[in-house]
A protein has these predicted regions:
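Compact mixed alphabeta submodule
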Residues: 93-204
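OB-fold ssDNA-binding interfaces and closely related basic DNA-contact patches used
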Residues: 1-119, 172, 176, 180-184, ...
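Acidic, low-complexity intrinsically disordered tails
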Residues: 206-208
Length: 208
C-alpha cells in the first residue's frame, strides 16, 4: 500500500524493544514473561563500540555449559571470557522493555520470591523496588539493593495487561545465533575493522 509523502519515515522501520536503563537511587520495574539464561562475550566493534556475542557453549534450556555447539568466539579470541547475562522483560514507564539483570539483584529477588511468590504473575506478582548505589569511584563500583519491604503483591492494571497481551518469549526477543551465523558475523567484523562502519553488523545486535 502506498502512503502519503508526509507520512513516510524515509527508511525501514524496526519493531524493536527498548532496554531498561538503570538510574542512580530508586528504581521500580514490573517483571513480565519468561527469563532468558545466557552468557555473552563482549567484543569491540566499529568505533570502539562493545558488541555482545552469545556464548554458544552455554545451553539456555539446561542452564549449563554443555559445549554441544561450536563456540567460534572462543576459537577466534581464546583470551576472552564470557560473562553472566540473564535478561527478562519488564513494564516501566508505560512500556515493555528488556531488563538486563544484575546477578546480585536477581539473587535478592529470588530470595524475596520464596515469601512473595512469582514476581512475574499478572495477578499475584509484585513490583520490584531497588536502589542503585555507587560504592566507589570506578564504573564497576555499583551495588543493587532490593527494597523488599516495598515489594507488595499487585495485580496488573488493564493497561498493563494490554501491554503484555501479545508478549514475545525472550527466545524471540534475543534470538540465539547459529554457529555458522556467528562465524559469519565475526568474519565481517574482522574484515570491516579497517573500513567504514557497516550498519548491517550493528543491526545484528538490535533487540527484536
Amino acid at each position: 500500500m502506498a502512503i502519503k509523502f508526509n507520512q513516510t519515515k524515509g527508511e525501514a522501520q524496526k519493531n524493536k524493544i527498548d532496554s531498561y536503563q538503570y538510574v542512580e537511587g530508586d528504581n521500580k520495574v514490573r517483571m513480565v514473561g519468561d527469563m532468558l539464561p545466557r552468557y555473552v562475550y563482549w567484543l569491540k566493534g566499529e568505533n570502539g563500540k562493545n558488541l555482545p556475542f552469545e556464548c554458544l557453549s552455554f545451553d539456555r534450556d539446561a542452564e549449563a555449559f554443555t559445549n554441544v555447539e561450536k563456540d567460534w568466539v572462543r576459537e577466534y579470541h581464546p583470551e576472552l571470557k564470557c560473562g553472566w547475562s540473564y535478561a527478562i522483560q519488564c513494564i516501566h514507564d508505560g512500556k515493555v522493555k528488556v531488563l538486563n539483570l544484575k546477578k546480585k539483584l536477581l539473587e535478592q529477588i529470588m530470595v524475596a520470591a520464596e515469601d512473595l511468590g512469582d514476581p512475574t504473575d499478572p495477578e499475584t506478582g509484585w513490583d520490584v523496588y531497588f536502589k542503585r548505589v555507587k560504592t566507589g569511584p570506578m564504573a564497576y563500583n555499583v551495588e543493587y539493593q532490593l527494597q523488599a519491604l516495598k515489594c507488595k503483591p499487585r495485580a496488573l492494571t488493564e493497561d498493563e495487561q494490554a501491554l503484555i497481551a501479545e508478549l514475545k518469549s525472550m527466545d524471540e526477543v534475543l534470538t540465539r545465533p547459529t554457529p555458522d551465523a556467528q562465524k559469519e558475523l565475526l568474519d565481517r567484523l574482522r574484515e570491516g575493522a579497517s573500513n567504514e562502519p557497516d550498519e548491517t553488523v550493528t543491526d545484528e545486535f538490535d533487540i527484536k
